[in-house]
Amino acid sequence: MGTGIRATSSGQASTIQVNRPLFSELWKNYPVKMAAPDVYQTFGGQAFALYQENPTGYANACALRLSKALNYGGMPIKQTTKGYKVKGKDNKPYLLRVKEMISFVENNLGKADITLRPKNNEDVSSQLSNKKGIIIFKVSGWGDATGHVTLWNGNDCGDSCYFVHHQQGVTTTEVLFWNLK
């Protein structure tokens, strides 16, 4: 899971381990193409209770899906992780908001390896062909979310992709991508 980087300064050398989860482990633990109500029910616990109380307010489950993949795929979310978290029936913490998932990923993996800024609803998916990793779409114009987080397998997203929008006034302003082996 780790990659070593060797840094040298003033005659001193040190190796820094950069740890990233394996894509195959995240994908194996990601609820691929599972509808949001089913995601909440499967995860249970506090997450499902909140969904049952307010299905409209908790209609988006993308951060919950990615939280599961991270929790079981080698980059667990800790109780001390900043952000709005809830517990699933497995007693693990899950992030529910895209904004907080972006912070979590950046804090653990650094800035995105690739940042794309589509113009005029341009489909930039070809620039990620044959790459695998975590993908985040920052979206303008949605009333209930600031974006979408998911996994990209080189051809498609684990649930939904938002490279192009067919809804008036909705655009993807930025695509952030972290490459995983």
Residue ranges of predicted features:
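N-terminal capping segments
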Residues: G2-K89
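Detector for Asparagine
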Residues: N19, N29, N54, N60, ...
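Generic detector of leucine side chains in alpha-helical contexts
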Residues: L22, L26, L50, L64-L66, ...
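Active-site or metal-binding loop neighborhoods of secreted/extracellular toxin and effector enzymes
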Residues: M1-V18, I135-K181
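...with weaker cross-activation on analogous glycine-rich loops/strands in unrelated enzymes
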Residues: V86-Y162
